[in-house]
Design a protein with these regions (language model features):
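Right-hand nucleic-acid polymerase module
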Residues: 81, 85-96, 100, 119, ...
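Conserved polymerase palm-domain catalytic core
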Residues: 5-134, 139-149, 238
């Protein structure tokens, strides 16, 4: 997509990066069921989906009547919910939004759920260079003013679907700068070259993971795990980063346990 944009506008332009706050926590069951009903799915499968969603409902009996009346419009955070006094969870008030990350239904829902926003961006706003994966999306455009106006309209459309754009992760930056999307850092050079760099935080996480696993896995198994990860990421790493990671795995697999 970046190369296609470059052929038309060069590297002069901007990218609007968007992220939904607590995405899976705020997927509404009623709207999700409307999406599934619009698809060619048999009644038995729809019933099973409905039962699965019922298990994901959140007990919010601790809320006041006024809070409960507006809970579907407020951002829900399952991490903060863990600190709620369990004695207050009586089952009297259930909130029908939130999905458990990891199961098959949540993976499918994560792809499907914002399709109304997708259609709005592509058809109503006419954005040609638009991309979304789960809760991360971007729009590339040569006009910054257009993106600023589009952002406000997208924010309102997302709100209709029960979603809220994360103010810390939603921003407009120049295409020629270094910006992050889906754990990679990108930049569009004046030559048309698409620069991709691994997120340094991802390297830090992998180093910690390897050190932790080095006490649990045999050297050959740890090496296989590392090699698999390295093959998937080495093209986005600098020479120094590759060398540092290689040195780490050698150190971890040769030391005495």
């Amino acid at each position: 997509m970046l190369r296609k944009y470059y052929r038309q506008y060069g590297n002069d332009g901007y990218v609007l990066l968007m992220d939904y706050s607590k995405y899976y926590d705020n997927i509404r069951h009623d709207k999700l069921m409307d999406i599934f009903r619009s698809l060619p799915i048999d009644e038995t499968s729809l019933w099973l989906i409905k039962q699965s969603l019922k298990r994901d409902e959140i007990d919010v009996s601790y809320m006041t009547d006024e809070q409960y009346a507006h809970c579907m419009d407020e951002v829900f955070d399952s991490l903060k919910y863990q600190s709620v006094d369990k004695s207050l969870l009586t089952g009297e008030k259930m909130m029908r939004k939130h999905l458990n990350i990891g199961d098959q239904l949540s993976q499918i829902a994560g792809i499907l759920y914002p399709y109304q926003v997708d259609s709005f961006v592509k058809i109503v706003l006419g954005c040609k260079y638009y991309l979304r994966y789960s809760d991360d999306s971007l729009i590339i455009h040569h006009d910054k003013d257009f993106l600023e106006k589009a952002l406000e309209q997208i924010r309102a459309k997302a709100k209709e679907e029960g979603l809220t754009l994360n103010p810390k992760k939603t921003r407009i930056v120049k295409l020629s700068s270094l910006w992050r999307f889906m754990q990679l850092q990108y930049s569009l050079a004046s030559t048309g070259r698409v620069i991709q760099k691994i997120n340094p935080k991802q390297l830090t996480r992998m180093r910690r993971k390897l050190k932790k696993l080095s006490h649990k896995l045999p050297a050959d198994e740890l090496t296989r795990l590392y090699n698999s990860w390295f093959r998937a990421h080495y093209k986005t790493m600098s020479r120094n980063q590759r060398a540092n990671m290689d040195n780490l795995i050698k150190e971890l697999t040769t030391k005495e346990k």
